[in-house]
């Protein structure tokens, strides 16, 4: 049973892999399989706009969600060669949502936290009515009962996690509600039992929260400190060279037009910018269209 929040299907990722250019980043799943159900299972990966954040979120969702069968979808990619391939494949209750989209659908920021909470809760009740007491009013309360009754843990993927922190900075009521929601979901003894993996992605790192201790159990991977996430954050130099060969573009020209970020030992390129050059061949000023581009 596929839901909007709970156990979504794999169509979005399927569509991405059907694109003219898809660069295999499924190696990230080998890392998440390694940290799943360990103390390193809380991940916040922040990167600038247009850096393929949603693609990563869709990939994680397609791989872990019990709502679909993704074996054939992943079989042609790197993760299928890993010993852990079958271990996580479609084995978890996945909750996946994009805060930006929820905010539009909820109509305004004031209702967004209850919109998200109730949206998840209603789908959990639909699927697991028999194990959730009628008095439960929070998504995370329901998750706790479900794990207790079924043993099945959750993978929670939040795209644009920081919208309410970024765009609603003046709205302290909404911020407080949202941070309490995240704490209920991720912080403390009980969440550590029902969460198998949490993956938050957005532009800001958690350390930018004024009340950052609220979520100090998250490992942060940022553009300035990417560590083992580096090769999954953008396109690497090797990947861009390979695309240049395929599309008959001059690598040095691409490189001088686009001075990649240096991350660890990887020169990392913005995927959308590179794809745009490969397909159009136009070296226009890409950044002017992407909004502000500060490194945080």
Give each language-model segment a name.
Residues 1-296:
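Phosphate-binding site recognition
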């Amino acid at each position: 049973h596929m839901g909007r929040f709970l156990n979504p299907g794999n169509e979005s990722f399927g569509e991405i892999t059907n694109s003219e250019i898809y660069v295999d980043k499924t190696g990230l799943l080998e890392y998440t399989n390694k940290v799943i159900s360990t103390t390193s299972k809380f991940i916040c990966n922040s990167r600038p706009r247009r850096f393929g954040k949603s693609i990563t979120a869709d990939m994680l969702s397609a791989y872990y969600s019990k709502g679909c069968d993704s074996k054939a979808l992943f079989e042609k990619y790197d993760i299928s060669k890993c010993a852990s391939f079958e271990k996580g494949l479609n084995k978890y209750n996945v909750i996946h949502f994009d805060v930006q989209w929820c905010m539009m659908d909820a109509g305004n920021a004031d209702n967004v936290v209850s919109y998200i909470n109730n949206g998840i809760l209603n789908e959990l009740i639909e699927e697991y009515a028999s194990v959730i007491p009628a008095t439960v009013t929070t998504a995370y309360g329901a998750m706790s009962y479900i794990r207790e009754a079924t043993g099945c843990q959750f993978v929670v993927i939040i795209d644009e996690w920081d919208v309410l922190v970024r765009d609603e900075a003046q709205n302290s009521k909404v911020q407080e509600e949202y941070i309490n929601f995240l704490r209920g979901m991720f912080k403390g003894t009980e969440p550590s039992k029902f969460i198998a993996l949490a993956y938050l992605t957005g532009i800001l790192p958690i350390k930018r929260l004024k009340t950052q201790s609220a979520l100090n159990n998250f490992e942060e991977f940022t553009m300035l400190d990417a560590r083992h996430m580096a090769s999954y954050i953008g396109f690497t130099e090797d990947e861009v060279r390979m695309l240049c060969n395929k599309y008959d573009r001059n690598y040095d020209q691409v490189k001088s037009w686009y001075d990649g970020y240096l991350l660890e030992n990887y020169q990392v390129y913005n995927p959308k910018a590179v794809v745009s050059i490969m397909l159009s061949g136009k070296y226009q000023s890409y950044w002017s269209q992407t909004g502000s581009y500060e490194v945080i």
